[in-house]
């Protein structure tokens, strides 16, 4: 559920279910300057003509009026900041909050914070909080190193997924060597995994790659 998704022909992801509801979407889009910086603010809400549809059941919507979707963004010097929020239709309490911060100058830094209330979706049993971090550095014209981590803030910052990637490249080819360490919630009965992958791309010849996987746990 978000501002952009409200305008989609189908608000459901995947092809399992059809978005079988006619609706009206109304809102406000505005941009303004504050301290010589541009801010964009978008708000919308939908009115579904039918209750209890495939989509409204998925997002726990019990009335014809949807929750309120809010989107805001600005760029200050080299920093880009975005907010994507879902507010309860009746009490204006937050159900979903997404904050992202991007910096791309001498280094690449991306921070994504998400919190979702258990009432936001039909299949959720508990609140969630997570923080995604991506950090990259171009060493020279032919080498780049990057790492990423997805942390479960509800479980003592336990990492759900971590990766380290080294890229070697020139004008017509690229070699990626990656290490990926994944941890899963036991509710899904999935085992942790560690993967080392090597992939090679070359212009005009397409793609060649292989993965070496070891499950150590």
Language-model features: locations:
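Outer-membrane beta-barrel translocator/pore domains, especially the C-terminal barrels
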Residues: 1-217
